[in-house]
């Protein structure tokens, strides 16, 4: 596996593959890799001759009071995991390599509409940071295919929109959420949880399944289902950020006429913010 820290070397590597007629898959990450990330790499390997994985903790997508400094960095462990699943190159740029003029002078990319609600409302500027860094990485790697987890469903839709709207020649693949045996969605931030908190956190998935069963059983009082879920989780010590059944395309509150829905959830367990979602077809 090639270990690359400069944009110029990354481009040389990809261009050499291209000259050989080989395809390129891409998996952007912030590191601290778990089985969910490795599943993305395996999917990319199944689709492409070569796979690039980036590890970059992107300061542009963190707010002033968020966990940029505390975010776990486990580069050596990450490299070993990537070798084990057959990644061909890992791109490890510095902040200076990615933003040579500094964050304040950086041109940015913003996806209107779907960036504004839910995680976008809770974390102002977050999706602007995501859209900007992903656009830069796509321009560097020029992948045929890029792979993202469905756990960050809103992020996935933002990236699909920017690729479509900016006429990018990349196919975006969403990969189903990888879960622990308890149902808890795998996340790098799960490492912040104590053993007891982690056991309790599995209740999010249990409650989401209850909402899904209610909707599939014909209940269209979405507010009632949401409120019951929040009440049950708050009784277990969670604090609500948001919990809403939305139209899967617009992210607006679901109506009785909508068929493709997604339940979007963000809850705090202590200081740790946990997000999850469940797609539902009526």
UniProtKB/Swiss-Prot annotation:
CDD domains given for it? PanC
Recorded hits in Pfam families, A to Z, give: Pantoate_ligase
Q: Which residues form the active site?
A: 37 (proton donor)
The entry's keywords: ATP-binding, Cytoplasm, Ligase, Nucleotide-binding, Pantothenate biosynthesis
Q: Name one GO molecular function term.
A: ATP binding
The metabolic or biological pathway listed in the UniProt record of this protein is:
Cofactor biosynthesis; (R)-pantothenate biosynthesis; (R)-pantothenate from (R)-pantoate and beta-alanine: step 1/1
* Binding locations of beta-alanine: 61
Catalytic activity, reaction form: (R)-pantoate + beta-alanine + ATP = (R)-pantothenate + AMP + diphosphate + H(+)
Keyword RNA-binding attached: no
Please name the GO terms of the biological process aspect recorded for this protein, alphabetically: pantothenate biosynthetic process
Q: Where does (R)-pantoate bind?
A: 61, 155
Q: Where does ATP bind?
A: 30-37, 149-152, 186-189
Q: Which GO terms describe its cellular component?
A: cytosol
Q: What does this gene product do?
A: Catalyzes the condensation of pantoate with beta-alanine in an ATP-dependent reaction via a pantoyl-adenylate intermediate.
Oligomer and partners: Homodimer.
Tell me its family.
Belongs to the pantothenate synthetase family.
PANTHER family, per the entry: CYTIDYLATE KINASE/PANTOATE-BETA-ALANINE LIGASE, PANTOATE--BETA-ALANINE LIGASE
Name this polypeptide is given: Pantothenate synthetase
Q: Native species of this protein?
A: Alteromonas mediterranea (strain DSM 17117 / CIP 110805 / LMG 28347 / Deep ecotype)
